[in-house]
């Protein structure tokens, strides 16, 4: 008996719930038919009691996602929710007549909508992407939140790329109604970020909104939002800037590379070609504008100028390196400046302090001076044309070649006639000795020219290092001192836009 009672109670509750659902559905259906009755409602008519009454539309943008910013095409793609609120006196009812129902959702295409569009659209899609339902309250207030994917025109400032900050505006205005019929009001001073999905390329700095009027045209009004965004430079730093800096450092090594290896010009040209490739990559990213040059483009041009300068200096250094006494004479000031003064300033050890070849050459010349007279000819009108002074100790193995006689030329020396064959041999030895001394002197001059080239290389090495370091730091620190604020990007013409 108790089970039968429980079953009856459950059946009664289910029946009551179904009846209430049917009644609720019937109530909402009656309300929708009442509101959208063609005899009392026309969606083509502006909701105003007379022609002079204004319809106030409150507008607010909620940013859901910053999809992309195409620098070359200068287009910003965003996913936004465009909140619009207004009142329609024709869509009112008494809640007590409809089971205290105070809100109802109506298809937006069946009611009057303010034709608010994005004025600075860049792809022809001026309206929203999806016409969602509108929430209508019993007092006639309407809340409409359609989502939209907009592609708006955005003037890209490339001056500090890739450490740049952009201001992309979105201007909303009624397409057919002017200010005498629809008054656009800014619901919030900033766009909402409650449902924003962070971007991997841009940081949102500020999203201020403002209502613009034109003093010269009383019928003009629009709502403008400034999307102030800053680029995240990590991607371009890793893939563009650091490789450029490393390639530039290779250009520094050109001055440290010995001139004898013959690869100076090859390295310079290779670095120049690599920088040219990076410059071509940048030209495909930034917009083709002549108003500003991007920061990374300036840096590449700076390094290309330095590399070109290194090519010119390398040519000059190679020219100096391969000079010889037969083609050039070293001026005294060159010896003073490049062989005595600059090596000390550039932390180079002077070659005469460390060159073993120079020390050996000096010792050999000293021995030649000490051994002079071991075998020499005496010439003059009183001398026999085939007479020579002889050191007996040095010609013990030449017995019979001549007859020595004591002479006053010095102790241990004698004089006597010698054969013509011996004289030819002595002349040959003298020629060889003179030739070797001449070659040794020429080699000394060539080594001096090589050392001058090395000093010039080291001088330009330090100059190149300082210019590269200070130039790089000066260029890339410049954007860090820029004070970006919301007012920085507000253009003067925003306070008085032209009439459309």
UniProtKB/Swiss-Prot annotation:
**Where, subcellularly, is it found?**
Synaptic cell membrane; Cell membrane
One Pfam entry for this protein is Neur_chan_LBD
Q: Which domain of life is it from?
A: Eukaryota
Residues annotated as transmembrane: 238-258, 267-287, 300-320, 459-479
Task: Look up what happens after changing residue 83 to D.
Answer: 9-fold increase in affinity to the conotoxin BuIA (15-fold decrease in K(off))
Under the subunit heading, UniProt states: Neuronal AChR is a heteropentamer composed of two different types of subunits: alpha and beta. CHRNB2/Beta-2 subunit can be combined to CHRNA2/alpha-2, CHRNA3/alpha-3 or CHRNA4/alpha-4, CHRNA5/alpha-5, CHRNA6/alpha-6 and CHRNB3/beta-3 to give rise to functional receptors. CHRNA2:CHRNB2 and CHRNA4:CHRNB2 nAChR complexes exist in two subtypes: LS (low agonist sensitivity) with a (CHRNA2/4)3:(CHRNB2)2 and HS (high agonist sensitivity) with a (CHRNA2/4)2:(CHRNB2)3 stoichiometry; the subtypes differ in their subunit binding interfaces which are involved in ligand binding.
Q: Write the protein's name.
A: Neuronal acetylcholine receptor subunit beta-2
Tell me what gene encodes this.
Chrnb2
């Amino acid at each position: 008996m108790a089970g039968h009672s429980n079953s009856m109670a459950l059946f009664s509750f289910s029946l009551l719930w179904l009846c209430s659902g049917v009644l609720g559905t019937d109530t909402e259906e009656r309300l929708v038919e009442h509101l959208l009755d063609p005899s009392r409602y026309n969606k083509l008519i502006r909701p105003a009691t007379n022609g002079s009454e204004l319809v106030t539309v409150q507008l607010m943008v909620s940013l859901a996602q910053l999809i992309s910013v195409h620098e070359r095409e200068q287009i910003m793609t965003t996913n936004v929710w465009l909140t619009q609120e207004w009142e329609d006196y024709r869509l009112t009812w008494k809640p007590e007549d409809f089971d205290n129902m105070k809100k109802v959702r109506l298809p937006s295409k069946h009611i009057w909508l303010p034709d608010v569009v994005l004025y600075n659209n860049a792809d022809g899609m001026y309206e929203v992407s999806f016409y969602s339902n509108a929430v209508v309250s019993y007092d006639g207030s309407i809340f409409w939140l359609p989502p939209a994917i907009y592609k708006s025109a955005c003037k890209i400032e490339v001056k500090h790329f890739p450490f740049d900050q952009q201001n992309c505006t979105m201007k909303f205005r009624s397409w057919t109604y002017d200010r005498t019929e629809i008054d656009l009001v800014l619901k919030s001073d900033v766009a909402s970020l409650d449902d924003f999905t962070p971007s991997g390329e841009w940081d949102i700095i500020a999203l201020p909104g403002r209502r613009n009027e034109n003093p010269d045209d009383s019928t003009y009004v629009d709502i403008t939002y400034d999307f102030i965004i800053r680029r995240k430079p990590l991607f371009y730093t890793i893939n563009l800037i650091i490789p450029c800096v490393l390639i530039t450092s290779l250009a520094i090594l050109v001055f440290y590379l010995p001139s004898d290896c013959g690869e100076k010009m090859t390295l310079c040209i290779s670095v120049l070609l690599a920088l040219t490739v990076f410059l071509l990559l940048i030209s495909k990213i930034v917009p083709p504008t002549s108003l500003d040059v991007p920061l990374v483009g300036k840096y590449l041009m700076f390094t290309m100028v330095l590399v070109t300068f290194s090519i010119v200096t390398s040519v000059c250094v190679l020219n100096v390196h391969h000079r010889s006494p037969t083609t050039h004479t070293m001026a005294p000031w060159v010896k003073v400046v490049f062989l005595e003064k600059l090596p000390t300033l550039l932390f180079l050890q002077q070659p005469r302090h460390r060159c073993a070849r120079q020390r050996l050459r000096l010792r050999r010349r000293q021995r030649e001076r000490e051994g002079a007279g071991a075998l020499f000819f005496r010439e003059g009108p009183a001398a026999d044309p085939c007479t020579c002074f002889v050191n007996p100790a040095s010609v013990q193995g030449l017995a019979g070649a001549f007859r020595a006689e004591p002479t006053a030329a010095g102790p241990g020396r004698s004089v006597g006639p010698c054969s013509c064959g011996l004289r030819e041999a002595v002349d040959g030895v003298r020629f060889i000795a003179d030739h070797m001394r001449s070659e040794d002197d020429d080699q000394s001059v060539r080594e001096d020219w090589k050392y001058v080239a090395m000093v010039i290389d080291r001088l330009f090495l330090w100059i190149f290092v300082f210019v590269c370091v200070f130039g790089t730091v000066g260029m890339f620190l410049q954007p860090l001192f820029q004070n970006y604020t919301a007012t920085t990007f507000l253009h003067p013409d925003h306070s008085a836009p032209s009439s459309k």
